[in-house]
């Protein structure tokens, strides 16, 4: 119950489709719906809404119709490892000298998001190589983000920028610095990966959630250990989930399980994950109530992603 006596809505459980890479996208969505997930974080890649495939428009329309029938919402994720370069993981990035292909890909991803009715597109900075000066990398990133925000404004999409361990922007402080460089643009929001908070942030995970709330538009979740960037199934890491999920109470955007390395047992892992999260969320409400409850995040994008 909230402090006003009104029961807080359930969190919007979602699953990242990179964890179902061995499934056709429509099959993955049906399975997730059957398990009780209300959202899908769709990773654009060769097998799932390939942004360069012939017939993309028809496939997007087909998936949009399926999402409607299943009553599911969507976020577009862009973390495919070899989507743009078959030999170099995640290349090029927004801080590469040859960033044009990444910018074009992200622009296409926003168009797909708009056609699906998905209000958020996820993105990240990239790894800074030793031969690139720090100030050059930050200047490139800010410049490319400014251009992407122009497209986002035109299409009505909010960017959900993810700090990623080992990349130029790897923590909340880095995100806040970049957002300040962009003038606090209302469509520049945060994708918070709960495991990353455990991995490298100085504060405890629940405190990271509370710090993130003013910018929060998308959440990725999995277990993790301190100092080790490895996405683990729930219960295999060190995170105390009830207070973390209690801190998210009232947040309406996706809370999306990200276990891309568990495709070999995707349906079973997805089932275990939602069972764990529901139990931990109930325990969080029982122990912590709704103190520190979430708002809508940037540009209202904490609201449920969907077509209608």
Where are these regions (language model features)?
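Alpha/beta catalytic barrel-like cores
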Residues: 21-32, 43-46, 87-92
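Conserved alpha-helical segments that form or flank metal/cofactor-binding pockets of metalloenzymes
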Residues: 75-77
